[in-house]
A protein has these predicted regions:
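C-terminal structured domains
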Residues: 253-351
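Long, hydrophobic alpha/beta structural blocks
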Residues: 1-296
Length: 351
């Protein structure tokens, strides 16, 4: 069960110097919980980062704030230190976003929003959550004062960071950090959090290729070589494309419309097993595919008979190139499309 030990909310207005800390009424707690759940469990598009320097502004504030709460017995009675430190984190984000807005004003605008911070305790482990969330702004008709509001539905989290923490002897140490950014804005991780990616695109591509390939060998290959090689080929084709990969979408594309030739293959069970890996830390759930990784693993060698082996590279539609037939005599043959004249002439004889 998740317990929120401390939480804060600051409105960020790029036109003023400091963030505005807001008291959180009890009926707003459901919003805070939803933002935390999205950042910690519901969001499946994130990357894992590590802390190269524990003395940067945000990481130092997180450690000191969390240590103070732990020293108070996980119940915040004296809010002085937590409020000062959460104010510092909010000021850092506002300053960074003001700089980015000035630099990028001719191209785009920084997404408007507020910053939610929370220290949570769940299953005996501490985590600190920072989320940049959507808010709307309007001016009071009488006072012309600027007001902020939050949508009743479709609560959007623009960016988030979930910092694993360990507490020992009154000190708090950072672990891995799960970072989400809906726009790919570099400033969130690089300038605000000041963290570095734990996995490169090459490592992510290798790990996804290995994990999915291992599950296909375990659950599909033993039942149907035809289905195994079709799915393996589709996986290679997707990862060989120079594009952004969303792991959940990748698995969906593999299985949504695919109908196994062998009815004993439970494709939904395979899909669930593969999606369960998204909660681990062996790869990021969103990364840029590295085609060079797949190129090294894209050739498959088939034994045709004692004298012929067939080597097939990754191809989008292998059935258009190679067909398998059984003659009435019982003989099994492969029909291979050939566009190389020399190879064709080496075997062709006019009747």
């Amino acid at each position: 069960m998740m317990e929120i030990l401390y939480r804060s909310l600051h409105n960020l207005d790029l036109s003023i110097e400091n963030p505005v800390r807001k008291e959180i009424p009890s009926d707003f707690n459901s919003y805070i919980v939803e933002y935390i759940k999205f950042a910690t469990t519901e969001n499946k598009v994130s990357r894992i980062y590590f802390v190269p320097d524990h003395n940067t502004t945000v990481m130092h504030c997180i450690a000191d704030l969390s240590a103070d709460v732990v020293r108070q017995g996980n119940t915040v009675i004296d809010k002085t230190i937590p409020l000062e430190l959460s104010d510092s984190i909010a000021r850092k984000l506002l300053a960074i976003e003001q700089t980015v807005q000035t630099r990028m004003a001719h191209i785009t605008d920084v997404q408007r929003g507020s910053i939610v911070q929370a220290l949570i305790l769940e299953d005996g482990g501490y985590r600190f959550v920072i989320a940049k969330v959507e808010h709307s702004e309007w001016y009071d008709g009488e006072t012309l004062a600027k007001n902020f509001g939050f949508p009743g539905e479709n609560k959007r989290v623009w960016k988030s960071a979930v910092v694993d923490l360990s507490a020992e002897d009154g000190n708090v140490i950072h672990g891995n950090i799960k970072v989400f950014c809906n726009t790919g804005a570099l400033y969130w991780a690089r300038d605000f959090l000041e963290v570095k990616e734990a996995n490169s695109d090459k490592v992510n591509t290798e790990n996804v290729l290995n994990i999915v390939g291992r599950e296909l060998r375990r659950s599909v290959k033993k039942k149907s070589l035809y289905d195994y090689y079709n799915l393996k080929n589709s996986l290679n084709h997707a990862l060989q494309s120079d594009q952004m990969i969303n792991y959940s979408d990748l698995i969906g594309d593999l299985f949504d419309t695919y109908q196994p030739s062998d009815p004993s293959i439970d494709k939904e069970a395979v899909r669930r097993k593969l999606l369960s890996h998204a909660d681990g830390e062996k790869f990021d759930t969103q990364f840029h595919a590295d085609p060079s990784v797949v190129k090294k693993n894209s050739k498959t060698k088939y034994r045709v008979n004692a004298y012929v082996n067939l080597i097939v590279e990754e191809v989008h539609d292998r059935e258009a190139l190679i067909k398998a037939k059984k003659w009435p005599s019982g003989e099994q043959v492969l029909i291979v499309s050939c566009d190389d004249d020399d190879t064709f002439e080496a075997f062709y004889k006019e009747e």
